[in-house]
């Protein structure tokens, strides 16, 4: 990496807790990345105030003002490119992006999903993991591709499911892990340790055959 931090944009729909974790990590001395813009798809997103409190420029691309997905995606893409971001992190962004948008940002678009992908793509992941009797659950940071929740996984945070766990209890512990692994992945990419090469993930110059794993005693 060069001495200049990699500019990162974060896209949100809600309260922005993962965005705040990413942003706070970027404020640490020697961070290889800097959050240069937070973009929301609704004016009521709580994360806008969180970002502003950290001194991060914010903008809103209100999805309801656009007649279709294509026009919204085009406006969002223009906002992100105008920010100068080299990496875009979707953090609680509740829209499915078009294949055209994904292709435009190929190799520099991340998402976090609350399951150990490829398990439980889509919604209600915590309840589904409990119903299946799984021993472990967690979250995955992955590159975004046209396949929903199907891009190459970079890192997973994993925890053990406890006897008597509820979806809400598991969700709280998964969020703790999310706030660890998402900034970590941004750091790995910005420092050049993780790379996207023609649809594959490389770690320290070698193909990543399995996701990097983070297990936290506090979340176990």
Task: Give residue spans per PLM region.
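Donor/substrate-binding cores of folate-linked one-carbon enzymes
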Residues: 25, 33, 41, 87, ...
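Membrane-interface segments of envelope glycosyltransferases acting on lipid-linked substrates or membrane lipids
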Residues: 6-10, 36, 128, 144, ...
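Short, structured coil segments at secondary-structure junctions
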Residues: 54-55, 105
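Glycine-rich, highly charged phosphate/nucleotide-binding loops
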Residues: 64-76
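An anion-binding loop in the catalytic cleft
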Residues: 2-7, 30-32, 60, 180-187, ...
């Amino acid at each position: 990496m060069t001495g200049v931090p990699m500019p990162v944009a974060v896209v949100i729909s809600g309260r922005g807790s993962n965005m705040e974790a990413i942003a706070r990590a970027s404020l640490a001395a020697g961070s290889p990345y800097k959050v240069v813009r937070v973009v929301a798809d609704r004016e009521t997103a709580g994360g806008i105030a969180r970002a502003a409190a950290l001194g991060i420029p914010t903008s809103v691309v209100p999805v309801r003002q656009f007649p279709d997905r294509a026009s919204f995606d085009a406006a969002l893409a223009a906002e992100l490119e105008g920010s100068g971001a080299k990496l875009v992190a979707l953090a609680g962004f509740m829209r499915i992006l078009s294949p055209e948008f994904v292709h435009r940002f190929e190799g520099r678009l991340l998402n976090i999903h609350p399951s150990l992908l490829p398990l439980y793509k889509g919604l209600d992941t915590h309840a589904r993991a409990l119903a299946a009797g799984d021993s472990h659950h967690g979250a995955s940071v992955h590159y975004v591709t046209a396949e929903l929740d199907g891009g190459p996984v970079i890192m997973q945070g994993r925890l053990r499911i406890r006897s008597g766990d509820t979806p809400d209890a598991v969700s709280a512990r998964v969020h703790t892990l999310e706030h660890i692994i998402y900034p970590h992945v941004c750091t790995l990419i910005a420092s050049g340790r993780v790379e996207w090469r023609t649809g594959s993930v490389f770690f320290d110059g070698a193909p990543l055959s399995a996701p990097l794993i983070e297990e936290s005693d506090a979340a176990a």
